[in-house]
């Protein structure tokens, strides 16, 4: 249950069944376990959710098939960068596509050798495509995210009952700012939403309205009227107190009742509690609600950002590649 919950909350891509090596005889043996070292970025603490998942794998499928994953809690990429004095390279590691390309795709396992096209079709196409370099699936989509609006459902229910507000209004930025103003008036000057990445939102809104190139030299092109208009929409709402910029991450403002909503990475759902604790120490269920990232009204090019990393494997032996593929199947099923 914990594994499925973690995967859902981390916004992992849908699962699939493994069909590696075209159904050939396995190279794995529980009598002679295959050892895999892994570096990951999902929390450096020993008791991180990812480390608990790896322990669960070792105790179940890993023991059954003869695979043992050894976690190295290290975020320093000096070894992968080939710098002197670094530790031995891991068998499996978290990486962005740009990192994988820099390492040389000839040095990495092509996951297409271990998963069929039908298998990969079960994944979000954009996430899969992001890990393909020169026709090879060298980054396996594991932890991906976009941006969402998170709302305190208990507070929203009262707001909606009094004002007739509807979540569908948040589909556009016009509706978002309209609801933000209405909430501030209803709540006696409390901001509606905390934003984690306000500049990125300004950019996306402008691009959806056909702004074209946003930069001139090393900074924004302030003569770009579409960009200026988008900027002013957010600036006006900030000055009026309809929204605010988060303190690091918007879930803090939502969990303390400072704002009704937070707009940030979908992976932030890991950090939302079951209860909101208000300044007077009263609590109530969060009843978390989600809404998609708003878009510019009438846009012909709606944009959805994606972020996150996948898993790569250094090319060593087919035995280790098969073991890595078995682990990925388990992780994403």
Q: Where on the chain are the PLM-derived regions?
A:
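Short helix-initiation/N-cap motifs at beta->coil->alpha
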Residues: 72-81, 171-175, 244-256
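Conserved N-terminal structural module of periplasmic/extracytoplasmic solute-binding proteins
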Residues: 2, 7-100
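Extracytoplasmic/periplasmic solute-binding protein
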Residues: 136-142, 147, 174-220, 227-228, ...
């Amino acid at each position: 249950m914990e594994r499925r919950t973690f995967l859902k909350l981390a916004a992992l891509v849908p699962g699939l069944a493994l069909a590696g090596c075209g159904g050939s005889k396995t190279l794995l043996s529980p009598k002679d376990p295959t050892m895999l070292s892994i570096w990951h970025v999902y929390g450096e603490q020993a008791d991180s959710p990812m480390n608990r998942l790896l322990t669960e794998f070792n105790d179940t499928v890993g023991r059954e098939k003869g695979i043992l994953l050894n976690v190295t809690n290290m975020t320093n990429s000096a070894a992968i960068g080939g710098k002197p004095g670094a530790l031995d390279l891991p068998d499996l590691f978290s990486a962005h596509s740009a990192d994988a390309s820099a390492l040389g795709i000839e040095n990495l396992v092509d996951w297409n050798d271990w998963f069929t096209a039908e298998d990969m079709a079960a994944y979000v196409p954009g996430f899969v495509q992001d890990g393909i370099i020169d026709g090879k699936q060298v980054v396996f989509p594991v932890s991906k995210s976009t941006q969402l609006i998170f709302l305190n459902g208990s507070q929203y229910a009262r707001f909606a009952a009094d004002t007739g507000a509807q979540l569908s209004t948040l589909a556009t930025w016009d509706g978002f700012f309209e609801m933000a103003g209405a909430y501030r008036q209803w709540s006696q000057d409390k901001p509606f939403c905390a934003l984690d990445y306000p500049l990125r939102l300004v950019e996306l809104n402008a691009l959806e309205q056909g702004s074209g190139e946003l930069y001139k030299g090393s900074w924004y092109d302030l003569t770009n009227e579409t960009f200026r208009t988008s900027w002013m929409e957010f600036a006006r709402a900030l000055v009026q107190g309809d929204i605010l910029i988060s303190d690091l991450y918007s879930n803090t403002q939502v969990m303390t009742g400072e704002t009704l909503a937070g707009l940030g990475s979908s992976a932030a759902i890991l950090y939302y509690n079951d209860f909101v604790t208000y300044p007077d120490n009263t609590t109530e269920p969060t009843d978390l609600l989600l809404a998609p990232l708003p878009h510019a009204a009438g846009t012909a090019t709606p944009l959805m950002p994606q972020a996150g990393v996948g898993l790569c494997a250094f090319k060593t032996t087919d035995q280790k590649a098969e073991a890595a593929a078995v682990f990925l199947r388990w992780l994403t099923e």
